[in-house]
């Protein structure tokens, strides 16, 4: 089988594979937001609810987070793959059989020239023979580089394979039937092997440290450097959803599609195969709504993939088709079709039993038909009723113990027009936070209740007749030290959405001041100072003194 690299085709189709990953990232971020909303809901009380919240946060949340990290890693490697080929092998298409034929032709010509030279010496024949020798050497070097690239390129995806292995191990654990106790009616991870979360948690902690450093530096130094593609994706996925837990459960069920992860492992080992087949196997809806659509259609497609299909990775929505690389058949080949040992090892060690079920054709699906999940679905189905929601379009009776209310997280997640803000910026502005060094940061409005940030009594000062004031603040009992301990505050009658809208207006007419500091005039005529990172995202914003 010939080893071929059609560089132009690979570069063009990289966008298709990355689009699938981006849509999956969006869907998984929505799953995480739904789980978080359920976990912090103060209306749902009791032993079963409390244990269920903890169980979902400790199991399904890291699974969704791991999928995000996996997709980000695939995007990084997909973007790097063509450039690595160009630097290591060639800047044009390389077809193994063509190079071999050229080498054989040179060998034939050299043999003919030597025979002629022996029979009848011709001036300049030696120089021509040397030229052919040089040409042959160059072709052989290109071929050797192709072989070497073929052997080493799959190593670039080792991190992705490790993440896929962790995700598969996590899926096996949560389906083991050991997470729910019928006797006590509670959920627990005590009987589960949670080692699979280690690699995912390590990435999460590193991201948190980087984010904390960026916010701290953003208030004290010059412009931050341009971020990588993965970081841009990370900053762009936070969006309010208001998903009910029943939708989250649908998404979680789809996490159990083992075929998806087997295909993902195959995709990682055969990147050229992936890029060569992705475009032709995407469904029409994906091409229309994601590749050729606008931001709204992409968001709608991602939301549909979450609530109606799960992850957007099964059926005709993309990856379960597009990643069947070893089954593609008549496509360009660079590597042999073999399922990686790591993925095969995971497959062989999963206890099948009743946890596997055939779901049409010859595809083997990994299902959440386990006691744990059924109990969770049964117990948590009341979550919609506790929030006054119904699947039938009406309102449900809510008693005094289940009174509907919106948490601060839900209020923030439902804000509109937040595309210009970094993921944690609105929490930073509206609630205040403690950075990784333990310093109190932000807090520029009193509009929300029960926030970490508080005004220190007796320190409030009116700054102007527009309603702007300042005060010394503390966050979770820690006094703020930056800016002499003061924060400036938006008017007390401004809603969170009004604050966002005014910051957006100030952003649109901003002028540069120094470092990464800008200022602009909000829609209500108030001057707003902003810290903006190298990617154009707002780190913090507050009324100017």
From Swiss-Prot:
Compartments reported by the entry: Secreted
Primary location class: secreted
GO cellular component: extracellular region
An example molecular function term from Gene Ontology annotations: endonuclease activity
Enzyme Commission number, as recorded: 3.1.-.-
Keywords of the record: Hydrolase, Nuclease, Secreted, Toxin
Domain of life: Bacteria
Keyword Nuclease: yes
Domain LXG: 1-217
EC primary class: hydrolase
Subunit structure: Probably interacts with cognate immunity protein BC_0921. The interaction inhibits the toxic activity of BC_0921.
Function: Toxic component of an LXG toxin-immunity module. The C-terminus (residues 322-545) has RNase activity in E.coli which is neutralized by cognate immunity protein BC_0921, but not by immunity proteins specific to other toxins with the LXG domain. Degrades 5S rRNA and several tRNAs in vitro; cleavage is endonucleolytic within the anticodon loop for tRNA(GAU-Ile) and tRNA(UUC-Glu) but total for 5S rRNA and at least one other tRNA. RNase activity is suppressed by cognate immunity protein BC_0921.
Recorded family membership: In the N-terminal section; belongs to the LXG family.
Protein's UniProt name: Toxin BC_0920
Organism: Bacillus cereus (strain ATCC 14579 / DSM 31 / CCUG 7414 / JCM 2152 / NBRC 15305 / NCIMB 9373 / NCTC 2599 / NRRL B-3711)
């Amino acid at each position: 089988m010939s080893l071929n690299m059609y560089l132009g085709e690979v570069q063009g189709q990289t966008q298709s594979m990355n689009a699938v990953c981006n849509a999956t990232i969006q869907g998984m971020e929505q799953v995480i937001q739904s789980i978080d909303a359920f976990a912090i809901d103060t209306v749902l009380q009791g032993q079963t609810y409390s244990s269920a919240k903890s169980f979902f946060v400790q199991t399904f949340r890291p699974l969704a987070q791991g999928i995000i990290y996996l997709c980000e890693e695939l995007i990084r490697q997909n973007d790097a793959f063509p450039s690595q080929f160009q630097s290591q092998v060639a800047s044009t298409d390389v077809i193994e059989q063509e190079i071999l034929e050229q080498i054989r032709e040179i060998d034939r010509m050299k043999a003919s020239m030597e025979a002629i030279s022996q029979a009848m010496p011709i001036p300049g024949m030696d120089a021509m023979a040397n030229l052919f020798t040089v040409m042959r050497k160059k072709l052989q070097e290109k071929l050797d580089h192709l072989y070497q690239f073929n052997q080493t390129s799959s190593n670039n995806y080792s991190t992705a394979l490790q993440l896929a292995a962790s995700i598969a191990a996590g899926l096996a654990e949560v389906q083991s039937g050991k997470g729910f106790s019928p006797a006590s009616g509670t959920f627990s991870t005590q009987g589960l092997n949670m080692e699979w979360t280690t690699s995912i948690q390590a990435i999460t902690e590193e991201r948190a440290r980087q984010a904390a450093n960026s916010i701290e530096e953003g208030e004290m130094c010059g412009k931050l450097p341009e971020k990588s593609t993965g970081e841009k994706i990370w900053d762009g996925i936070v969006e309010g959803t208001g998903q009910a837990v029943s939708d989250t459960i649908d998404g979680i069920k789809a996490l159990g599609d083992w075929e998806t992860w087997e295909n993902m492992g195959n995709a990682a080992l055969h990147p050229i195969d992936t890029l060569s087949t992705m475009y032709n196997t995407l469904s029409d809806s994906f091409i229309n709504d994601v590749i050729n659509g606008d931001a709204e259609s992409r968001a709608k497609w991602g939301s549909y993939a979450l609530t109606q299909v799960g992850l957007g990775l099964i059926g005709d929505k993309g990856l379960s088709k597009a990643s069947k690389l070893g089954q593609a058949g008549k496509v360009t080949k660079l590597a042999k079709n073999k399922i990686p040992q790591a993925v095969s090892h995971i497959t062989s060690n999963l206890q099948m039993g009743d946890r596997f079920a055939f779901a049409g054709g010859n595809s083997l699906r990994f299902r959440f038909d386990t006691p744990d999940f059924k109990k969770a679905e049964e117990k948590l189905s009341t979550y919609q009723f506790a929030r006054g929601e119904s699947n039938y379009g009406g309102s449900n009776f809510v008693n005094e113990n289940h009174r509907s209310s919106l948490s601060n997280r839900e209020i923030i997640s439902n804000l509109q027009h937040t595309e210009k803000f970094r993921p944690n910026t609105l929490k930073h502005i509206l609630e205040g936070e403690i950075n990784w060094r333990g310093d109190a940061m932000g807090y520029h409005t009193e509009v929300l209740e029960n926030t970490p940030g508080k005004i220190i009594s007796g320190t409030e000062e009116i700054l102007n007749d527009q309603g702007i004031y300042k005060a010394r603040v503390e966050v979770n009992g820690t006094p703020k030290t930056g800016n002499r301990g003061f924060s400036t505050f938006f008017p007390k009658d401004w809603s969170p959405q009004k604050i966002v809208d005014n910051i957006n207006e100030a952003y649109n007419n901003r002028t540069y001041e120094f470092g990464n500091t800008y200022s602009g005039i909000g829609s209500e005529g108030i001057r707003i100072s902003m810290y903006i990172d190298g990617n154009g995202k707002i780190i913090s914003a507050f009324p100017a003194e």
